[in-house]
Structure formats: C-alpha cells, structure tokens
C-alpha cells in the first residue's frame, strides 16, 4: 500500500491482510515503526489542532522517546532555547498613550550652532531649552484626596480628637492593606488644620502690636509737649549752686558764727578794700565795732567779744554783694581800713 503525501515526499507502508476483509490500521504507529518519532514531531508543528490535544500527544511522545533512548543507549532529548521577548525592551513610540517625554530631554543637543557636531537631539543655541510637545492625553492630573472633605477641622484640638477616634476604628474595620492609606489621609488633614490655626493666630498679634505702637507714639508726643512747656532754669542759678569754696585748714578749730546785726550795703563799702586786694589769701584785722555780712560757706569767722576778728578767705572767694547795688567806687582811700 502506498500513500502520496504531496509531491515532496512519498511514504510506503506494507500491511499484510492475511485473508481478512475488514482490517483496522493505525497509520501513526506504522509510520513511527519505520521512520521513528522525529517524523511525528515535525507533523505536530504544522498541525493546527487544539492545545489540549497537542499537550496530550506531547506527553505520549516524551515517554516513547525515553523508552527508545534507553533501548538504543543514546538520548535524543534536546533542551529548547528560551525565546527573547523584544516587547520587554522596546515599545511603540508612536503610541500616544505612552509618556516618553523624559527620553527626549536626555537627547538634548551637546553643542551649539558655531560649527560643532551634534551627536543626537535637535540643534539648540546656548541658553535655550528644548520644547517638547505633549499630547493632551498624557497630562497627569493631581488626585484630590477625600480625607480633607470627610474630616473638616476648624480647630486643632477637634482635629486631633477626631483623628485618634477614626484611627482606632480603622484598626477594627479596615484590612491591613487599607490602613496605611487611612493613616496618611488623617495626617494630611491634621497638617492642614494646623496651618489654618497658625494663620488665624498670626493675624491677632499683628493688630495688637499696631495698637500698642500707636499708643506709645501718642505718649511720646505728650511727653515732648510737656517737656517743651516747662521753663528751663537759667545757667546762672546752676553755676551758683555748683560753685563751692573750699576752706583751708587752720591751726585754730572753727567756731560757729555768732548772730550779728544786719547792716546796709553802704557799710560794706566803707570797710572792704577793692576786689584786687582780695585775690590772694590774706588775713585782715578789723575793729570789734565793725560787722560784715559774710556767707557761711565761703569763709570761717573767728570772733571774740574783746579781741579783733580775723577773716580767712580762699583764693577764689568773693564776698556776697547785692546785684541791685552799684559797683564799688575805686576812689575809696585804703587808709580807711586799718
């Protein structure tokens, strides 16, 4: 019996009938007996049958190959090479869904227009940047978290209490995978509430500080007005207060001055020498009957009822003279003073 399997190859099988009318023949087994299992493997690759049938046949063939290899002493099993998947390494750049803007940024020009060679990317001048056109579909939108809407918090204390309560409830109700998201949303709500509270508190001291500044300015103005209205003391009075005459040390102890009768300024001119005679320290003897108005701070007076009176003056001392009195006359003779 001969069968034609196309023009390329002819397979010949000899099957004895032995006087039988109905004979059942397994063509695959007969081919395996003559050509071996390799012929059947090639036929399976070209076969378009179901995957279930192919898996069942492959297991049967593997068992036959192991049996034939053990009988012949040679192993014909070969390991299949793993195919390389190019889809993992490359992608379709024309696909608008893929956002590949970062790749274009890396391909920026490495030189300027002044005769340099550009390795890759567009030609760009110094200081300029590459403008990449992005499709509208690839724009990323920020997702608004529902935590701010579900947990409004006007005050800080209320937010902390609600956050603790919700966190305790989430441990019992939610699963372990959803707990981190829950805690993050609570923390964000607490942070937003703290920021709002700080802004409100910052507004109050500003208003208070402005009012305080106004009050201080008004007080300063009032003090300036009052100080300008008070009359200043004359310099003459200050100098009179500052001037103090020092009394030199003497051998005799000081005696408190006796009460003397007041005399008119005319008596002073009769018994006092001109100012030129009193510049140097000197002692002058006066009669007991004469009396002078002497300042207690400028001189020390030693008086006795029956003896003469000695007056000790310092170098810069001056006798008190009435301001309304006229200057002493220079024509007074010195012989009048003993």
Swiss-Prot record:
Xref: Pfam families: HUN
InterPro entries registered for this protein in UniProt: HRD
Source organism: Schizosaccharomyces pombe (strain 972 / ATCC 24843) (Fission yeast)
Role noted for this protein: Component of the HIR complex, which functions as a histone chaperone that cooperates with cia1/asf1 to promote replication-independent chromatin assembly.
Subcellular location as annotated: Nucleus
Entry keyword Acyltransferase: no
Single Gene Ontology BP annotation: chromatin organization
Compositional bias (Basic and acidic residues): 193-223, 321-330
Chain positions covered by the region annotation Disordered: 38-85, 134-301, 314-338
Subunit structure: Component of the HIR complex.
Disulphide-bonded residues: none
Annotated Low complexity bias: 152-165
Residue numbers of Phosphoserine PTMs: 175
Biased composition (Polar residues): 276-301
GO CC, alphabetical: chromatin; HIR complex; nucleus
Name of the protein in its database record: Histone promoter control protein 2
The family this protein is said to belong to: Belongs to the HPC2 family.
Keywords for this protein: Chromatin regulator, Nucleus, Phosphoprotein, Transcription, Transcription regulation
């Amino acid at each position: 019996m001969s069968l034609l399997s196309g023009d390329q190859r002819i397979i010949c099988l000899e099957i004895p009938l032995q006087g039988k009318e109905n004979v059942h023949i397994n063509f695959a087994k007969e081919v395996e007996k003559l050509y071996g299992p390799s012929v059947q493997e090639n036929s399976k690759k070209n076969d378009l049958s179901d995957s279930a049938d192919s898996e069942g046949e492959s297991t049967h063939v593997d068992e036959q190959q192991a049996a034939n290899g053990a009988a012949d002493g040679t192993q014909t099993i070969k390991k299949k090479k793993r195919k390389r998947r190019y889809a993992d390494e490359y992608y379709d750049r024309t696909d608008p869904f893929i956002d590949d803007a970062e790749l274009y940024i890396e391909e920026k020009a490495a030189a300027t227009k002044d005769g340099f060679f550009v390795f890759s990317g567009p030609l760009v001048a110094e200081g300029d940047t590459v403008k990449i056109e992005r499709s509208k579909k690839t724009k990323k939108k920020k997702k608004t978290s529902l935590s701010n809407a579900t947990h409004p918090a006007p005050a800080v204390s209320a937010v902390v209490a609600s956050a603790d309560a919700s966190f305790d409830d989430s441990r019992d109700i939610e699963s372990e995978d959803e707990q981190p998201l829950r805690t993050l949303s609570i923390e964000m709500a607490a942070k937003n509430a703290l920021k709002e509270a700080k802004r409100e508190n910052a507004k109050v001291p500003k208003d208070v500080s402005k009012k305080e500044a106004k009050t201080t300015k008004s007080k300063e103005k009032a003090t300036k007005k009052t100080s300008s209205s008070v009359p200043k003391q004359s310099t003459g009075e200050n100098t009179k207060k500052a001037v103090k005459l020092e009394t030199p040390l003497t051998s005799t102890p000081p005696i408190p001055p006796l009460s003397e009768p007041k005399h008119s300024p005319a008596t002073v001119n009769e018994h006092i020498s001109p100012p030129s005679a009193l510049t140097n320290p000197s002692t002058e003897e006066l009669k007991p009957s004469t009396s002078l108005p002497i300042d207690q701070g400028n001189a020390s007076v030693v008086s006795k009822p029956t003896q003469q009176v000695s007056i000790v003056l310092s170098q810069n001392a001056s006798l008190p003279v009435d301001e309304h009195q006229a200057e002493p006359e220079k024509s007074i003779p010195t012989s009048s003073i003993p």
